[in-house]
């Protein structure tokens, strides 16, 4: 594959990532705008990944239509994505208007100065799902804020957990509460919330004080259509919304998920605690509710 288009794209991604990182370190750029189709957008992501959180980034793309996965365009950065509407082949009455809007947006972003913070507040990263929100909002967040910490929550949907890990690797947090680890179930058994293979390892590897719980680790998140497949007929189900259904894991699947936790946590060289909730792993895992399976 050395001479293939894909190999060339990978080489270009490596080069542009390194070059943009160098330009930013030299204070030669304050933002980034990219225009492209499928390959161009993938290359652009490598450039945007080289810039820190908060630096303006805009991708104008033919595949930003909702029909394609957005992970190729954004990944774990904070880029703004704009649909080009038409394919990109020179300037015409439509592309001119779209490009002008994109230029106006990036210029405006660069000109807006960040608000000056009165003092530096240490941040705690927390993974969260709809099925684990209540204890975070009612108990954990207020208690941490009372102690002077800023609380940053990440939706553990296959992207949010990875975003939290990325920021942990960059030293963004004073501590991490990995409260919603459903992505480990997905990494083993599929569904909508599959994350990177290294999920949950960044804070541990960087010796950031970490507390881990198996919040929602006993469910698999599926599309409503997939949840109705015959292989899931014997599973307990909870229709979370019109697009998403939660199903319970089996005893054997839970053993595999537990082994994944053990493998990752055993790498710890810093301060790590594992808390086991004795009365259920998520909001529907309670006696009398849809996913109760003691």
Map each language-model feature to its residues.
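Acidic, glycine-rich loop-and-beta core segments that form the ion-binding/anion-interacting portion
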Residues: 145-198
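Gly/Ser/Thr-rich loops at beta-strand to alpha-helix junctions
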Residues: 30, 34-43, 64-65, 126-136, ...
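C-terminal non-catalytic interaction/assembly regions of soluble proteins
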Residues: 191-294
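Cap/lid and interdomain-hinge subdomains that line or gate substrate/regulatory clefts
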Residues: 2-4, 67-128, 256, 263
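Short, acidic/small-residue loops that bind anionic groups at enzyme active sites
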Residues: 31-34, 43-73, 81-83, 150-156, ...
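Short Gly/Thr/Asp-enriched flexible loops that form oxyanion-binding sites at enzyme active sites
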Residues: 38-53, 137-141, 290
């Amino acid at each position: 594959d050395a001479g293939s288009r894909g190999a060339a794209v990978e080489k270009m991604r490596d080069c542009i990532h390194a070059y943009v990182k160098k330009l930013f370190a030299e204070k030669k750029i304050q933002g980034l705008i990219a225009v492209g189709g499928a390959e161009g957008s993938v290359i652009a992501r490598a450039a945007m990944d080289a810039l820190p959180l908060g630096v303006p980034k805009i991708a104008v793309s033919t595949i930003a239509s909702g029909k394609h996965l957005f992970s190729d365009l954004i990944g774990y950065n904070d880029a703004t994505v704009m649909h080009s509407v038409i394919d990109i082949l020179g300037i015409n009455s439509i592309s001119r208007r779209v490009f002008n809007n994109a230029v106006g947006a990036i210029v405006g972003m660069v000109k807006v100065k960040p608000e000056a913070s009165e003092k530096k507040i240490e941040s705690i990263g927390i993974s969260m799902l709809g099925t684990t929100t209540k204890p975070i909002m009612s108990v954990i967040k207020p208690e941490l804020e009372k102690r002077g910490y800023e609380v940053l929550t990440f939706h553990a949907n296959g992207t949010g957990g990875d975003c939290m890990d990325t920021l942990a690797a960059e030293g963004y947090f004073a501590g991490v509460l990995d409260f919603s680890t459903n992505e480990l179930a997905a990494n083993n058994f599929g569904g909508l919330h599959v994350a990177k293979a290294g999920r949950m390892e960044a804070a541990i590897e960087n010796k950031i004080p970490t507390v881990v719980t198996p919040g929602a680790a006993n469910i698999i998140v599926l599309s409503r259509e997939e949840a109705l497949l015959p292989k899931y007929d014997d599973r307990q189900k909870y229709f979370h919304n019109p697009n998403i259904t939660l199903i319970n894991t089996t005893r054997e699947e839970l053993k595999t998920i537990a082994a994944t936790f053990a493998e990752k946590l055993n790498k710890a060289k810093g301060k790590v605690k594992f808390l086991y909730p004795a009365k259920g792993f998520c909001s529907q895992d309670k006696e009398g509710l849809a996913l109760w399976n003691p």
